[in-house]
């Protein structure tokens, strides 16, 4: 295991993320995912990964890579773990890997929180200040630091509005949900004609 006194995550640490390579709701890929919108049948989806995925740390990855048989991979495929990278197809020493995943495909409701301060001169032009509020973990850095800043900006605008201040353009303050799951909480597709 590498020391934690460097730039990289420790070997037992796990980087989480979505395996979906697209943006937005996969069931409404080119249009806004709003209530009552048409959605594709999940059986029609072609861009979702077809293989199981389980994030692991690089300490565990090294154990698996050390045990893989097969020919050595091309040099451009090699990573930074100190091991011989093989194509696999078999495992050395008769090892076997069992992967169990407990993922399911389902729809969940997510809600964006959006506030507007109407512009005094150009109300049809927008300045958007936003942050997502969902997180893979507890979110102390991502997204809570950005959410704290967004809330402070909103509070400051509220104080300015009490003193009869108005912005030139409309200000949109947006708190997104479901950003971590392929930017699904974004409302960009619904507002493309305005933006």
Question: Across the structure, where does each feature detected by a protein language model lie?
Answer:
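Extended active-site and interfacial segments that coordinate phosphate-rich ligands
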Residues: 1, 129-131, 147
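Mature extracellular/periplasmic domains of secretome proteins
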Residues: 1-19, 120, 188-195
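A general marker of short, structured functional hotspots
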Residues: 3-4, 16, 34, 81, ...
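Generic detector of intrinsically disordered, low-complexity, polar/charged segments
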Residues: 8-10, 14, 19-21, 136, ...
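Soluble metallo-hydrolase cores and metallopeptidase-like ectodomains found primarily
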Residues: 20-141, 155, 159, 163
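Acidic/histidine-rich catalytic neighborhood of metal-dependent amide-processing enzymes
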Residues: 135-195
């Amino acid at each position: 295991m590498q020391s934690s006194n460097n730039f990289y995550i420790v070997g037992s640490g796990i980087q989480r993320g979505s395996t979906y390579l697209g943006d937005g709701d996969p069931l409404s890929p080119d249009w806004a995912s709003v209530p009552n919108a048409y959605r594709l049948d999940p059986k029609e989806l072609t861009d979702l990964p077809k293989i199981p995925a389980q994030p692991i740390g690089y300490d565990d990855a090294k154990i698996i890579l050390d045990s893989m048989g097969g020919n050595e991979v091309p040099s451009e495929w090699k990573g930074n773990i100190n091991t011989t990278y093989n194509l696999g197809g078999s495992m050395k020493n008769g090892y076997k890997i069992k992967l169990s995943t407990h993922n399911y495909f389902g729809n969940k409701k997510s809600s964006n929180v959006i506030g507007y301060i109407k512009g005094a001169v150009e109300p049809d032009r927008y300045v958007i200040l936003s942050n997502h509020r969902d997180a893979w973990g507890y979110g102390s850095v991502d997204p809570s630091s950005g959410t704290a800043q967004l809330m402070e900006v909103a509070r400051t605008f509220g104080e300015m509005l009490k003193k009869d201040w108005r912005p030139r353009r409309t200000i949109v303050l947006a708190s997104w949900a479901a950003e971590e799951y392929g930017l699904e909480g974004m409302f960009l597709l619904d507002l493309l004609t305005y933006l």
